[in-house]
Structures are given as C-alpha cells and as structure tokens.
Amino acid sequence: MTPDGRITSEFDDTAIIEPEEDDELADLELVVLDLAGTTVIDDGLVERAFARAADAAGLTATEEDRAGVVDYVRRTMGQSKASVFRGLTGDDDQAQHANAVFESAYAELVASDGVRAVPGTEDLIRLLRDAGVAVALTTGFSRATLDLVIDALGWADLADVTLSAEEAGRGRPYPDLPLTALLRTGTTAVDGVVVVGDTASDIASGIAAGAGLVVGVLTGAHDERTLLDAGADAVVDSVADLAELLGFHDEDDDFADDEDGDDDFDEFDDEDSLDDDVDSEDDSALASVEGPGGR
C-alpha cells in the first residue's frame, strides 16, 4: 500500500478506477461500518476484557491454555462475543457467564482508559449522510456495551442506525447485521450496500449479505493479506480513505449533487450516467469497483 493510502496488492484490479466500464453496482444507499477496530480505536481493550473473562471462566489454568485462548480470540475477532465464548467453552451456561464478565470488564476499561474514534470517522459519516447515503454502525458487542461506547464518543445522533449482533439475530460471519441494517434503513437493494470492517469475519458477513462492495481497513485486528484472503474487494488504510475509494472529491468542500442530477457517488450511478461525458468538470472521478468474480 502506498503512502497516500492507495491499494497495492496482487488484487489491485479489483479497485481500478475505470469510468468507461459498465457499472454493475446499484446506486449507493447504505454503508455498514463495524465499530471496534474500524471506527473506534481498540487499543487492546477487547483482548484485555477477553483475558479477564477467560480467567473467570477457568479457561486459562496454564500458559498453554492462555495462549490458545488468545489465538482463538484473535482469529474470531469481529464475531459475536457470546458465540466466541460458546466456541471456547462448549457450554452455554459457562459461555453466558464469561460473556457477562467480558461486558463488565470492557465497560470498566472504557471508563478507566477512555475510548477514541478512528480519525476521519465522524467526517466520513457526515459526508455520507449529507449525500443521502444511510450509515449503520454494527458490532459484536451487546446493546449495553454498544450504547456505552456510543455515549462515550457522543455519537448518539451520528449514524442512522446502530446494531448489536443480538438485535440482528446472529453475529458475524453471518449476513444478519448488514441485512438488518438494510431493512432498518429502508435500503432497496443489497447491491447498493457497502460493508466495511477490520476483520475476516466482517468481510465474510458482507459477502454473505451480497453487498455490492466489501472493504477491509487496517486499523484493527487483521492485516491486508488476511482481509484479501477473506474476499475483500479492496483494502484501505482506514475509514478516512473510504470517501476517495467511493469516488468523492473534495475540491470545493461541496459534495452536493451535480447540476445534471447525478450525485458525487458516481461509482453507484446507473449505466446512463456512466455514459455521460466523464471529462466534465461537474462529474466525479469515480471508479467502478468490482470484486473478484464480478460481485
């Protein structure tokens, strides 16, 4: 990846900007953003809370046990925390107890250490919503923990929808979170959905939901290779780079619709708009971003 945040990998073809290509994606309607590691800086809080919960559940009697728990937690990062504990314990009651300890420990860590947004997150969300694009914040945390983080950041009115795994039905890697966000926001087609996250589970969830674009970010748990191997259409340094990837231009700090009625999200414009003169000053420099297999 280059210093300016452009994608550099063997999958670069998935993010080439080609205004002349036929656009197979619908108009952009919804961006689904993960919470910890994607829009919120984790600072190791999740892993520390998991360690406390694992100790309380008796899962770390030896150093070998502890290493195994840490490895499992890292591999399953992004999934519902309750389901992770079920995988570790194999017992529902023990998993529920461990999850309760985790939620309590995470709340204590947020209170003592604070929580910070990934730089550029708030600007991105406001930009999207000003352009008429709905935004959902989703998480594997419980609703109580989600609300704690949202309140700590002052984000009560930032996004259109906030969703926990328990409210959607199943957590990642299942498609329930993106699809529930689609229903809650009145989004009309999965092709018009972009899913963004820092873990392989986020990517798998977006793919399972049939999202038009699935993007990985490098501010959280998993690296570029892991995200691409999981099927990400593109990987960027952080959510701050998402606007450029999606075709926004900020020359005049004005992201209103073009005079001809086409919006600045030309990646998701219909075929007719792509046939317009792409050299016009009023048109954005958007790209048709297609993933492997033409999804």
Where do the PLM segments sit?
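Asp-based, Mg2+/Mn2+-dependent phosphohydrolase catalytic module
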Residues: 1-29, 143, 147-295
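Short glycine/serine/threonine/alanine-rich loop segments
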Residues: 59, 133, 211-212
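A generic secondary-structure micro-motif detector
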Residues: 40, 71, 114, 136-139, ...
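Anion (oxyanion) recognition and catalysis
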Residues: 55, 129, 207
